[in-house]
């Protein structure tokens, strides 16, 4: 097998590495740099990538930066002239450039790659990344999470006992925290959390806003309306941010930034580290919530963490390092280069795939729960978040009405108990179900998440063997804001969600009890005295009335009343059957009055009835 390169496809910068012997090595670009700006420019019909594209961004409006922030957004396009490009196409141009100079370095064609993504990337974003690789002519052997890759780079040569490692990964546009267990060549992810819209770009923007406000107050001119001025400000802000990682104050000088009535205007200002920390403190504090959540989901406290690894260029910011040190109660490990660790780890995984690296097992997790909508609009989870992947889970569901010929499988991703509060990943239909009473057909729904975190769902009618499958497409994924909203709302609305769930459960129980009671009344007709049957009929009508009036308190009261008299009826029927069969062996035990005739694990499905005549 040919070399498998490892690519860190970053928001602001990308890197590539390859395994040489037993060691991963960064491949430098044609300019000799170890990282490449994730910038694409269109100029005179030519596509420029990397440093050359970044250098002329001030004068060329057809320059695209930070495209990674839009991966997985089906409606996002970049217009250049009369053509519109998807984020996958722009990302593919960066990957093509990396592929080319990697081939020049290796002296052989490169076809296979491992590409990294933020741990909190959803299914749509992962699919989009894989698609970008395909467009670039790469066979993407594996998609792995960035914190996991950096842990691979950190732990490759470690011979110590088991370690619990927390990876704090703050890049140019995304943020992740992962907790891993390392030992005996096994890299097991225990939990992951993050914010796919937080990174170094946001720190730059804080400086830009400060410069714009200051210039406006002093000169009465709003630089934010001048595209060329804003590009100069962005370059200056990025440089100032980097300078302040090493010095306590930096001077920002932008001559001829604008012009007023008196002539040219210049921007000259000093930015201290203290002021920068003040401007960006809210961004640093935003990383605390995922930090805490990752520990909580792993079932650990800070005292259980043996090492803290910083990854991503933005972790060079002193305030970030100090915050992590304070939260973790220990000095972060600085043994790996935060700009290069992810690519090095991806190259190690490439070596595992090619067979050059032995005795390493990578066990990653899925960041969000997956399931389907069931009766009453409930979100029934099949795979919980932070489940080790690859994984597969099946559950039996059934029909909601008699003689239902088809079921609609509504696939969802999120953490809320009600389907409407989660994100639709896709829908598909299983048809030609033979006519049968509700609850009888056995529909097996299977979720499968592959090693790349990409989701496949199938539904199979166990009676006929007919099966329908769907691979969730990138257009149906979640946005980063939606992921954060799901997690936040799941905590804020826990009480409200519990009440909704309780109401739906009650309605489902009432519906099921009415159905079962009517079935029982047909079975006992003529077998018991009317005086035994009438109380059940009366209680049944009372419950139906409460159901029709939508009175929840009445429904609960009448449900309990019907359950009691129905149980009494079942006892009398059992006693009569016993008397009729005295002396006969092999008497069967009583049936579960709540059974619907299907598997005990069967869950009523919220499926759409399909008219076969249409």
Curated annotation (Swiss-Prot):
Q: Which UniProt keywords apply?
A: ATP-binding, Chaperone, Nucleotide-binding, Phosphoprotein, Stress response
- UniProt KW Chaperone keyword: yes
Q: One Pfam family, short name please? A: HSP70
InterPro entries under this entry? ATPase_NBD, Chaperone_DnaK, Heat_shock_70_CS, HSP70_C_sf, HSP70_peptide-bd_sf, Hsp_70_fam
User: Chaperone among the record's keywords?
Assistant: yes
Extract the ranges annotated as region (Disordered): 573-614
Q: Cite the GO molecular-function annotations of the record.
A: ATP binding; ATP-dependent protein folding chaperone; unfolded protein binding
* Induction note: By stress conditions e.g. heat shock.
Q: Which residues carry this modification: Phosphothreonine?
A: 174
Q: What HAMAP family does this protein map onto?
A: DnaK (MF_00332)
Relate the protein's function as given in its record. Answer: Acts as a chaperone.
Q: Which family does it belong to?
A: Belongs to the heat shock protein 70 family.
Instruction: List the NCBIfam families.
Output: PRK00290.1, prok_dnaK
| Protein name according to UniProt | Chaperone protein DnaK
Which lineage?
Bacteria, Bacillati, Bacillota, Bacilli, Lactobacillales
């Amino acid at each position: 097998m040919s070399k498998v390169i490892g690519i860190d496809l970053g928001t602001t910068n990308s890197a590539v590495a390859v395994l040489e012997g037993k060691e991963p090595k960064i491949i430098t670009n044609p300019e000799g740099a170890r990282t490449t700006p994730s910038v694409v420019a269109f100029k005179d019909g030519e596509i420029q990538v990397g440093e050359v594209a970044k250098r002329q961004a001030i004068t060329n409006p057809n320059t695209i930066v930070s495209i990674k922030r839009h991966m997985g957004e089906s409606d996002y396009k970049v217009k250049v002239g009369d053509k519109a490009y998807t984020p996958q196409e722009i990302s593919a141009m960066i990957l093509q450039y990396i592929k080319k100079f990697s081939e020049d370095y290796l002296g052989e064609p490169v076809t296979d790659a491992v590409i990294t993504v933020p741990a909190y990337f959803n299914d749509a974003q992962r699919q989009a990344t894989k698609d970008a690789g395909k467009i670039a002519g790469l066979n993407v052997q594996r998609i792995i999470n960035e914190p996991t890759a950096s842990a691979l780079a950190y732990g490759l040569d470690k011979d110590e006992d088991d370690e619990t490692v927390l990876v704090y990964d703050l890049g140019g546009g995304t943020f992740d925290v992962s907790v891993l267990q390392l030992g005996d060549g096994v890299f097991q992810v225990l939990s992951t959390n993050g914010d796919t819209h937080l990174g170094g770009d946001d720190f730059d923007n804080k400086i830009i806003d400060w410069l714009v406000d200051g210039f406006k107050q002093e000169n009465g001119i709003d630089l934010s309306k001048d595209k060329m001025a804003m590009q100069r400000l962005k370059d200056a802000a990025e440089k100032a941010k980097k300078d302040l990682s090493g010095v306590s104050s930096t001077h920002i000088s932008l001559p001829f930034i604008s012009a007023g009535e008196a002539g040219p205007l210049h921007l000259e200002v000093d930015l201290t580290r203290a002021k920068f920390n003040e401007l960006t403190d809210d961004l640093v504090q935003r990383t605390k919530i995922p930090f805490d959540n990752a520990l909580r989901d792993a079932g650990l406290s800070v005292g259980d963490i043996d090492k803290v690894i910083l990854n991503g260029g933005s972790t060079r910011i002193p305030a970030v390092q100090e915050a992590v040190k304070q939260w973790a109660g220990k000095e972060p490990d600085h043994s790996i280069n935060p700009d290069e660790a992810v690519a090095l780890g991806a190259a190690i995984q490439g070596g595992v795939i090619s067979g050059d690296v032995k005795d390493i097992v990578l066990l990653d997790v899925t960041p969000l729960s997956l399931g389907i909508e069931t009766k009453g609009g409930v979100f029934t989870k099949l795979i919980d978040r932070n489940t080790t992947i690859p994984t597969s889970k099946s559950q039996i569901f059934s029909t909601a009405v008699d003689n239902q010929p088809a079921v609609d499988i509504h696939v969802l991703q999120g953490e809320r108990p009600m389907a409407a509060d989660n994100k639709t990943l896709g829908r598909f239909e299983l048809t030609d179900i033979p006519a049968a009473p509700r609850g009888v057909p056995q529909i097996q729904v299977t979720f499968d998440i592959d090693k790349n975190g990409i989701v496949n769902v199938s539904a199979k009618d166990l009676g006929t063997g007919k099966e329908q499958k769907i691979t969730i497409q990138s257009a149906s994924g979640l946005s980063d804001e939606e992921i954060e909203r799901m997690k936040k709302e799941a905590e804020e609305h826990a009480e409200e969600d519990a009440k909704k769930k309780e109401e739906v459960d009650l309605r489902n129980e009432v519906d099921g009890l009415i159905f079962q009671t009517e079935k029982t009344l047909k079975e006992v007709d003529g077998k018991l005295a009317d005086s035994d049957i009438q109380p059940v009929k009366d209680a049944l009508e009372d419950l139906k009335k409460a159901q029709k009036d939508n009175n929840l308190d009445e429904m609960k009261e009448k449900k309990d009343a019907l359950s009691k008299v129905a149980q009494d009826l079942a006892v009398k029927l059992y006693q009569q059957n016993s008397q009729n069969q005295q002396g006969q062996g092999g008497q069967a035990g009583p049936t579960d009055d709540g059974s619907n005739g299907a598997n005990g694990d069967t869950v009523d499905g919220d499926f759409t009835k399909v008219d076969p005549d249409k």
